[in-house]
Amino acid sequence: MKNIRNFSIIAHIDHGKSTLADRFIQYCGGLDLREMSTQVLDSMDIEKERGITIKAQTAALNYKARDGQVYQLNLIDTPGHVDFSYEVSRSLSACEGALLVVDASQGVEAQTVANCYTAIDLGVEVVPVLNKIDLPAADPERVEQEIEDIIGIDAVGAVQCSAKSGIGVEDVLEEIVAKIPAPTGDENAPLQAVIVDSWFDNYVGVVMLIRVKNGTIKLKDKVRFMSTKAETQVEQLGVFTPKSVQKQELKAGEVGFLITGVKELGQAKVGDTVTLVANPATEPLPGFQEVQSQVFAGLYPVESHDYEALRDALEKLQLNDASLKFEPEVSQALGFGFRCGFLGLLHLEIVQERLEREFDMDLITTAPTVIYEVVLKSGEKIEVENPSKLPDIGSIETILEPIITATILVPQEYVGNVMTLCNQKRGVQVNMQYMGRQVMLTYDLPMNEVVMDFFDKLKSTSRGYASLDYHFKEFQPSDLIKLDIMVNGEKVDALSLIVHRQSAVHRGRELASKMRELIPRQMFDIAVQAAIGSQIIARENVKALRKNVLAKCYGGDITRKKKLLEKQKAGKRRMKQVGNVEIPQSAFLAILQVSDK
């Protein structure tokens, strides 16, 4: 056991985490050159394209160190994006150490800081590594100083490497052996193994990635999941080198995969503890949480007969992504669809893209919303995540909205812009700290302002230099109202929004004018109105297309022309009574782009 090292890599998006992992695998001979694809551990196409890691993957590598001993290095790959922070904390809790990989030209970013604090809280040894030192812009001294100023760990003489060209990779491996402690645990104690990740395989069902903390797990053992109490039998055990290699048993300190008869991902929850039925552990390992959805959106098929196909597709995605929640929903404007819950906006985009790419679906997505707590005058408390489900204004005592604490790291020259943006979004400044060239701003922001377009605006106002990390803080009472959009006097439920009273009128006007551009002109006038309750706050008209009925009249009496124009008017009026308006997909997307300027 003393020769095992379990570690993961913490890094911001694009700081070279997956490339470094590839180099480790190549160096330790886990795959031969023919099998090396770039980013071996990122197995979903979308992970490679966006350059982000979503699911945790592992590799068990044998490394012959300079002291002549062979060490087993278990690399657990972690996601770096803020939406997947729970997965990160699970991956980290399975390790004794973490490599903090920082781009030597860019320096420290907010998500790195957040994940690093998570690691330190979990008592994991953090080893700083400077990557991309072969770039002309690399400035190792400045970045070492930044790591010390911002994160507060000693970074003098941090290992320098370039994962792309392979310089210094061996030094990093030596550093892992030297600095990261060996796992502790008792092979003979009752089994406690934490599920780091789980995914669905078409042939064997659910594959779980486990880290054995105490005890030993063998083939054919009966095991129990402690949070769901489900029991099942071990059918396969093994490790990934990243190819899967079967083993007879896994002992304390090891990381490997476990396949049982479980067919549903919901039973093998990430962070849960596995124990033996015959000799169970008294209590589970700490840190397990049920995943909470933060952002909700409606997904509707463009063709209504694709409804069942969409249900199948969502169920298949759910097999691999336990944090995706969905339930059927009916909208008057869009027909049958699903209300889905996501971890954050990136998660929403990824799910949408996977549905379109892997399952060939054509979708309409409504504007993302968050959960509100509504206290009724009767004293009852309800949760509302869909604006069209908000009860009548008269029966509401207060509406509480979720507030998040956002940590923003930004270079000094952009601080003013970022603070202005946060104030526009009704943010309250909590803290501001200067660290070298960077400034760390802490704000309490309403979540519904963040889901709209905060991230894009933050990037554009800081020329891409600001980075953001956020976590939920609490529900706070707020002056919120429901904004309805009416087309031709009829409410379109899918376009309703919950907004703050201050920005309602402005938001309504902007939406109405945007809708006017997007709704195709019909044979009759269409009125687009924004309303709060029964009060109309904005109106735009989509002008009718009309034929020139006077084209055939040359000269002659004015009454003839009047008669033709009146006849045309009467026809348009009749049309308007029976006509209905198709609202294009672009109009639903417009809501997302309407900004609070």
Swiss-Prot record:
Its EC number is 3.6.5.n1. Belongs to the TRAFAC class translation factor GTPase superfamily. Classic translation factor GTPase family. LepA subfamily. The keyword Hydrolase applies. Residues 2-184 form the tr-type G domain. Keywords: Cell inner membrane, Cell membrane, GTP-binding, Hydrolase, Membrane, Nucleotide-binding, Protein biosynthesis. One of its GO terms (biological process) is positive regulation of translation. GTP binds at residues 14-19, 131-134. The keyword Repressor does not apply. GO terms for molecular function: GTP binding; GTPase activity; guanosine tetraphosphate binding; ribosome binding; translation elongation factor activity. It catalyses: GTP + H2O = GDP + phosphate + H(+). This is Elongation factor 4. The gene is lepA. Required for accurate and efficient protein synthesis under certain stress conditions. May act as a fidelity factor of the translation reaction, by catalyzing a one-codon backward translocation of tRNAs on improperly translocated ribosomes. Back-translocation proceeds from a post-translocation (POST) complex to a pre-translocation (PRE) complex, thus giving elongation factor G a second chance to translocate the tRNAs correctly. Binds to ribosomes in a GTP-dependent manner. GO terms for cellular component: plasma membrane. It is a peripheral membrane protein. InterPro entries: EF-4 (IPR006297), EFG_III/V (IPR035647), EFG_V-like (IPR000640), EFTu-like_2 (IPR004161), G_TR_CS (IPR031157), LepA_C_sf (IPR038363), LepA_CTD (IPR013842), LepA_IV (IPR035654). Its main location: membrane. It is found in: Cell inner membrane. Disulfide bonds: none annotated.
